Amino acid sequence: MKFRYLTVLFAMLLLATDGFAQQRYQVAACDWMMLKRQKLGEFQLTKQIGADGVEMDMGGLGKRVLFDNKLRDPHFQKLFRHTADSLGVQVPSVAMSGFFAQNLIKRDNHKDLALDCLNTMEIMGAKVAFLPLGGSGHDWEKAGGARDTLVQKLHDMGELARERGMVIGIRTGLDAKQTIKLLKEINSEGIKVYYNMQDDADAGRDISKELKKLGKKRIAQIHASLTDSVTLDNDPRVDMLKVKQTLDKMGWSGWLVVERSRDVKKVRDVKHNFGTNVRYLKKVFQEGARRL
């Protein structure tokens, strides 16, 4: 009887361990890169490519005061949330991709923009916002007025996120050492790094070494893709198994989000590119985890 009890207990522990392994890393894709920015069809497409979730965008920004955001409308709030839930598609994060082109330093309404994003996150159950700094130029990368202004605005936005139990992940384009310095200046628990493999690969930096330098607690989420060339399964610029082993040792867990890594010969084939990349990441980070 005792032996049977121990056998059952051991089997339960194996199942629990397997469940944890499946959930340690989850895989999503960016709606705007799949040509589904704030379109209801993004959830069905996410299901079709086999992803666990989708990173929704806030909508275009341009010269607008606020994002072109459908989810300020109660009708779309209910419709989008119901559709995502009914298909079992999670929304781990919401992107402010408008700041790839717009300069945050020159925006006086940064708090309003942050609140718009945080409200949308709350509706969709997301905990992480993506904020790229690509549109803010390069002057802020060195000491001076531009950096001081950016740091203050990011601090303000971070505190709004912190108060709601959320995080804004910034994409800096800098190496780990410089990024850590920037985070210390911002000094807000609501601001972390949204790590992008593409930046380090393009700069010739070692992805695994940069991840280790950043450390588990500074990384909110990861864009696990590179500059368009080939899909991840054929790209020699990143050793994804080594990346997984690095993250395992760091004790990091969370969402890996496909942004690019499109085959330039089939750049418009959304299902092929994102489906291939999602399957590859799942093979490495989920199926591989179950075999350990």
Spans of features found by a protein language model:
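Bacterial N-terminal signal peptides that target proteins for export
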Residues: M1-T7
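Histidine-acidic metal/acid-base catalytic patches
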Residues: Q22-V27, L35-D52, A176-I191, Y195-L292
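Conserved beta-strand positions in the central sheet of alpha/beta enzyme cores
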Residues: E55, S93-A95, F130, G169, ...
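Glycine-rich, proline-tolerant flexible connector loops at the mouths of alpha/beta enzymes
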Residues: D57-R81, L133-E141
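Charged helix-capping and loop-helix junction motifs
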Residues: K70-Q77, D108-L115, A143-L154, D206-K212, ...
